[in-house]
Design a protein with these regions (language model features):
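PAPS-dependent sulfotransferase catalytic domain
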Residues: 60-68
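Short, hydrophobic/aromatic alpha-helical segments in well-folded domains
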Residues: 42-43, 66
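Boundary/linker segments flanking structured domains
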Residues: 1-39, 49-52, 68-230
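GIY-YIG nuclease signature motif recognition
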Residues: 44-46, 53-61
Length: 230
């Protein structure tokens, strides 16, 4: 038996490729010459394969750390509660707040700026969404709008995987599974109305995708005699 057969295998190749793409995006240089993932303070948004915004978040620990936890095995509340399925994320957009880079994570004034930035981004993506909604469990508290810094956006799915991941049948199956898992969480716990809204939003997203897939499928629905099976 070859020695290699006794060695533990790493992550699947497609997962490794996506993680590599995530690192490449976070290593892109901002206009100030710094890697965008190294911004300590910032706001981020995730988009699906249709370009629809699906989630907004903030961090004061580092964009790289927070985004990686969402999209890899390091669980976040949003992933654990089946609010966000990392499989749905095709693009990331980030708004680094470089002016706060040297501020302590507990700095009150900096937190106010971060909260304003997140609220501004939240309103921005809601206007971009054809559903008028994202999957966040709660609304971002209203604050004074902030002039946002220049954002950077990129696709995290390698070209060789994109068409497979975007295939509507794959996405329908995945989204239905996520909805079932979220519905189970809701049935077993006392949850917020926001989580029920997330379930509703996911159901609407699934209905649209399933309807689009049905309408683009050629042929007619079969007709059978009573008692016959297709």
């Amino acid at each position: 038996m070859p020695e290699s057969e006794n060695e533990p295998q790493g992550v699947p190749q497609d997962v490794a490729s996506i993680r590599k793409q995530i690192r490449a995006f976070l290593n892109k240089l901002a206009p100030n010459g710094k890697k965008i993932g190294n911004a300590k303070w910032g706001v981020y948004a995730f988009y699906d394969y249709d370009g629809e915004p699906i989630y907004v978040g903030q961090t004061n620990e580092m964009l790289r750390s927070r985004i990686s936890r969402h999209l890899t095995n390091q669980r976040t509340d949003a992933v654990a509660m089946n609010v966000l399925d990392p499989f749905e994320v095709a693009d990331i957009e980030v708004w680094p707040l470089w002016e706060l880079q040297n501020k302590n994570s507990g700095d009150a004034d900096s937190k106010l700026i971060l909260n304003s930035a997140e609220h501004t981004v939240f309103q921005f993506v809601l206007k971009k969404s054809s559903f008028g909604a994202v999957l966040n469990e709660g609304d971002i508290a209203a604050t004074k709008p902030l002039k946002l810094p220049t954002s950077m956006r990129g696709c995290i799915i390698p070209a060789e995987l994109f068409d497979q991941r975007k295939h509507p049948d794959v996405r329908i199956a995945r989204r239905a599974t996520t909805i079932a898992a979220l519905a189970r969480v809701i049935s077993e716990r006392s949850v917020s109305k926001g989580l029920r809204r997330t379930l509703m939003t996911q159901a609407v997203r699934l209905q649209r995708l399933a309807t689009q897939r049905y309408n683009e499928t050629s042929g007619a629905v079969p007709t059978v005699d009573p008692g016959e099976e297709i």
